[in-house]
Amino acid sequence: MTKIIFMGTPAFSVPVLEQLASAYDVIAVVTQPDRPVGRKRILTPPPVKKAALELGIPVYQPEKLRTSSELEELISLEADLLVTAAYGQILPNTLLESPKHGAINVHASLLPEYRGGAPVHYALLDGKTETGVTIMYMVEKLDAGDMISQRKIPITEEDNTGTMFDKLSKLGAELLMDTLPDFLAGKITAVAQDPEKVTFARNISREQEKINWTKPGRTIFNQIRGLSPWPVAYTTLEEKPFKIWEATFEDTKTSGEPGTILTDKSTLKIVAGDGTLIVPTVIQPAGKPKMDIHSFMSGAGRNLSKTTRFGE
């Protein structure tokens, strides 16, 4: 049976690991170290570690794989194939070249578009109507390897980064399992990425999280769903942070300055730069838990007036 080393960290990677382990001999799992999580900073293992332990697979958690003693140990396992999915570190050539069939990666975009660590976020932020998963060879340069297989999936108006992560995670596992038999048999010819079509999905900055109400409504709507459920788009209300977790978009022109509030007793609408409307459905005022808009409007939201503007 083909011996595989798997490397991954977040929940996105778990279905890939589980599918691999159901059909192949996964001899080791490499993931990031346990990290403090939440307000109480409780040391928490990555989702992949939990899954690997449940499957009875040995787990390695080097802080920096490139300089760790575990690197040589992994090479000495003489795996037939290395598979990665959102591991989180650049891998050295000594490891990439050690398996018989090399190293391949499950990447959540239609390469060469969106190389980098936040491809799902950017597909939503840019208003794409489809994205997908690419299986490609691993090289030292970030997400630059030749492509082995690719599969597309639509993005709907109701999707956000969270829903697309779930869909792409399952799609990636399915595509990998469909690809591996022919790949291991040497029946697939990989295709180089077109350098003219390369784009990057760098990690989201704090500046990208803040809503600019002078922008078109469609752009703001894509920002909200592209940053949900993490890190979450925010604006300010009376100079305090105000997160918008979920919203809908109304493509109707309305008069009013950007950030102007239109409200009745149960709904809240905010004017965007082109006069269209953002209609928040799940929000989080400063110092409060996340709540649906009806709860907000029956409480603190009752005090909002038409002279109040978001972003001020």
Swiss-Prot record:
CDD domains: FMT_core_Met-tRNA-FMT_N, Met_tRNA_FMT_C
Reactions this protein catalyses: L-methionyl-tRNA(fMet) + (6R)-10-formyltetrahydrofolate = N-formyl-L-methionyl-tRNA(fMet) + (6S)-5,6,7,8-tetrahydrofolate + H(+)
Molecular function in Gene Ontology: methionyl-tRNA formyltransferase activity
Keywords: Protein biosynthesis, Transferase
Cellular component GO terms held in the UniProt record: cytosol
Residue numbers binding (6S)-5,6,7,8-tetrahydrofolate: 109-112
Gene3D superfamilies with a match to the protein in the record: 3.40.50.12230
EC number: 2.1.2.9
Superkingdom in the source lineage: Bacteria
Protein role: Attaches a formyl group to the free amino group of methionyl-tRNA(fMet). The formyl group appears to play a dual role in the initiator identity of N-formylmethionyl-tRNA by promoting its recognition by IF2 and preventing the misappropriation of this tRNA by the elongation apparatus.
Protein family per UniProt: Belongs to the Fmt family.
Protein name: Methionyl-tRNA formyltransferase
